[in-house]
Amino acid sequence: MAMFPLQSALLPDEDLPMQIFEPRYTALVRDCMRDDDPRFGVVLISQGREVGGGDVRCDVGTVARITECLDLAGSGRFMLRCRTGERIRVCDWLPDDPYPRAMVQAWPDEPGEPVTADQLEELEDRVMALFERIAAARNVLLPDRALVLGSDADTVDPGLRLYALASRVPIGPADRYSVLAAPSAAERLAALSDAVDSVAAVIEFQLSE
């Protein structure tokens, strides 16, 4: 699969707007657009940068499907709108030709301890409290819970709900990757819980200064 390493960790079911200008990635776009289902894999760069190569890449990512492609004629650039889908795991990195490529496999959630509705609600309460603390510090009104936490709060699959919740919390790439790379829903719950605690601690420290 064609791969696009990024400096952010994309979770399933997220929008991904992109401006493509580096020659190897414009080649990737052209190759993808020849398919009926244009898509590529996205993974987090653990070291290095997106431009120029020489990066060190993580091995867990998501599939990004191109939903809109605008060829900026004469500029050598593309504007893309993509939507991330299923989680993937890299089995083997192939030589860049000219863009990164890898053998990948779909990686659905592995069996584990069930995540209960009470556990999800408790985590959602903590996320809501986090946003309420930020809003109070900035003296702004917070939208209602459904808008803050997402209209997909009734999602039956706890693993998918945790992805959706994580996408709304202001956590960094490393924490987002921990959420993405958690093998099971229960481990994802633990990873996101730790990330929320870390963000809350940072915010309290900043507000105390």
Enumerate the predicted regions with their spans.
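N-terminal low-complexity, acidic/polar interaction/targeting segments
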Residues: 1-209
